[in-house]
Structure formats: C-alpha cells, structure tokens
Amino acid sequence: MRYLTAGESHGPGLTTIIEGLPAGMPLLAEDVNKELKRRQGGHGRGARMRIEKDQVQITAGIRHGKTLGAPVAMFVENKDWKHWETVMSIEPVPEKNEKSRRVSRPRPGHADLVGGMKYGHNDMRNVLERSSARETTVRVAAGAVAKKLLHELGIEVAGHVLEIGGTRANLTRDYAVAEIQETSEASPVRCLDGVAAEEMMQKIDDAKKNGDTIGGIVEVVVGGVPAGLGSYVQWDKKLDAKIARAIVSINAFKGAEFGVGFEAARKPGSEVMDEILWSKEDGYTRRTNNLGGFEGGMTNGMPIVVRGVMKPIPTLYKPLQSVDIDSKETFNASVERSDSCAVPAASVVAEAVVAWEVAVAVLEKFDGDRFDTLKKHVEEHRNLTKEF
C-alpha cells in the first residue's frame, strides 16, 4: 500500500491517492473528516485555521461505503484559494502580476533557500507553497484511512503531547490507548497532565506575544498490535525503522525514539530489556515495555510507543537575519502567516503517519486483496502466536 500527495498551501486544494487498500473495507467521508478536524485544533494555531474548514471529497475507489480494491482518491479544498487565485494561478498571468507576493528573503530553518537553489526558483514562493505543513492535511487524510483499517482489526492508535517549550507532562504510569484518546481530546494542547497543560498554554501565549515560536515532543501509542509485523532479515524491513522515518518526515520534526529511547544509553541492560512472561489467557507478554513494542525491528505484541521531537516553527513574526537573493544584502527574513506552536496538531499528524506504517506492515504480512480474508488471517495469526 502506498500514497502520493499533491497540492500547494494556497493553491486550489490538496490531493492524495491511495493504492493497495483491500476491497470491502468500510470507509466513509466522516471517518476522514473527524481526523481533519482534530488536526485543525489546538492552542497556538494561527489565523489560517479560522479560514479553512477542512472537509474531504472522496472521488474514487469507494462505492456504497466500502472500498473497491481500486485506488482511493481524496481532495481537500483550500478555502483561502479565493484570495490567492492570481498569485497562485495555474495559467500564465500578466507580467505585472508575476512578482506578486514574490519571496526573495529566505527564512532560516525553512526549505526556502536550499529549495530555491535545488530547483532553480528565483521566487521562493515556489518552494514554500509545497514545503508548507499545509500538506499534512492530506497525510492526515491518508492516515485516517489507515486508522480505520487498523480499528476494524482491533488495533487502536492514540497520540498526545508530552512536552511544549520545556514544560513536560508528569506522567507517573502508563496509559491505555482508550484513556489517552479520551483525556487528550479534552485538553486544548492534547496533554494528559492538566497542570502541565496550563503552563504549556501560557508559554504558547508568551511566545506569540514575543513574535516567537516554540516546539515540543509528541508521543504515539498503538495498542492491540499482533506480534511479528516487520522483519529482522533485512535492514529495510524493520518496522521501527520505517516508523522512525515517517516521524522525521513530518514538517519540523528532528528526531524519534521508542520506549525509554535515549535513556537506554544511560542504563545497564538489566534495567532496559523487557522480561518475557507467558500465561494461558494472554500468551507471551513482557513485564515492562522499555523497548516500545519492538525487538529486532519486529513488533513483539506489546503496545508500540514512539515519540517525536518538533522544533519551533521557522516562521517568526520578529524575523531573524537573512540575505536577499537578488541584492545579496542583509535583510530580515520574509514573514508568512503561521502558528506560534503547532505541537498539539502535530500529535495528530504523528498518529496518522504511524498508523499508516503499521497498516502497510499488516497488509505486507497478510493477504490484502479482500478485507474479510484479511480479518480472518489476522485473527488466525493472533491465535498461532499465542499458542507458540
């Protein structure tokens, strides 16, 4: 299973095409729209989210509420397009309009300058329109489809914010997926710790007042995962590696870790490895989950626990120093409309990309042509691993 996305931040809209879904899987536009709505929320979002009311148009691959096994095409309209029709026109425009909203002063930390160099664009709007996090709208749409597939197989995904601007949630126990879903949805910053959430919101407000931005850390937990997804036999078949790539591919994300993550480097092996248990009711489990549900690049049946770190958004309302590519003189960087903090929204994007990789791994391991046989094979596999 794979997908491609297309579209610019201020173009007519965004498109994704998914190939490889099994036939007969229940899927409605509402399954996607509820995830799009979640992405648009969160304390710290900018004015753009007051304009856009993202709704998906499914234009292919589904009939009467079920997938056909053919490619699924989805489109999300950019309502702000009406203000950008000349600037972002697909057709040629009069010469006097060609330089409207031209960007010649790249923003530090963004794709502007290097993208312009790479593709030979003397207007870096050609770069920023595609490199914008607006593209994650359709990544969330694709992830919503993956989450629906996983849900039907008894696999659930939840994300939450662990840290913003140096304020970290004080979590003294592990949370079940359903509990994460319920608690995070009730928080303006998608945080499980109410006290920390208040401090996070204050830091976001302070950053906005100062024309600055702040980043943070998000965590995604996947429960009900069968053992044996991914493989140890080749480096590129390891599922944790694929998830790490997916996390770091999200705009502004700079790293990923599983389980205790980098803390494992500071502990002896006896405090890191998860002891193996067995019971007739549950089969093989682990006493702890320090490795985040992975051993040898494969799921071990414990919940997947992965975290991603997001840098502050590069667009600053008090811009840093840059250089004009025309004159080579020093100027302040360009300013585009942006958020002061998008970490809460990014947790929804992280859910989407993790769900996608897990869904792909499920379809790689089991028959993926028909959804009814897929469900049967997953259940058979669960029983086999329990009895091993």
UniProtKB/Swiss-Prot annotation:
UniProt keyword annotation of NADP present: yes
PROSITE patterns named in the record: CHORISMATE_SYNTHASE_1, CHORISMATE_SYNTHASE_2, CHORISMATE_SYNTHASE_3
InterPro entries hit by this protein: Chorismate_synth, Chorismate_synth_AroC_sf, Chorismate_synthase_CS
One Pfam family recorded for the sequence: Chorismate_synt
UniProt signal peptide: none
UniProt keywords, alphabetically: Amino-acid biosynthesis, Aromatic amino acid biosynthesis, FAD, Flavoprotein, FMN, Lyase, NADP
Swiss-Prot/TrEMBL cofactor(s): FMNH2
Catalytic reaction(s) noted: 5-O-(1-carboxyvinyl)-3-phosphoshikimate = chorismate + phosphate
Binding positions (NADP(+)): 39, 45
GO biological process: amino acid biosynthetic process; aromatic amino acid family biosynthetic process; chorismate biosynthetic process
Note accompanying the cofactor annotation: Reduced FMN (FMNH(2)).
Region (Disordered): 95-118
Enzyme's top EC category: lyase
Molecular functions (GO terms): chorismate synthase activity; FMN binding
Binding site for FMN: 130-132, 251-252, 296, 311-315, 337
Pathway where this protein functions: Metabolic intermediate biosynthesis; chorismate biosynthesis; chorismate from D-erythrose 4-phosphate and phosphoenolpyruvate: step 7/7
Protein origin, superkingdom: Bacteria
Keyword NADP in record: yes
Family that this chain belongs to: Belongs to the chorismate synthase family.
NCBIfam families: aroC (TIGR00033), PRK05382.1 (NF003793)
Function: This reaction introduces a second double bond into the aromatic ring system.
Subunit structure: Homotetramer.
Protein name: Chorismate synthase
Gene that this polypeptide is encoded by: aroC
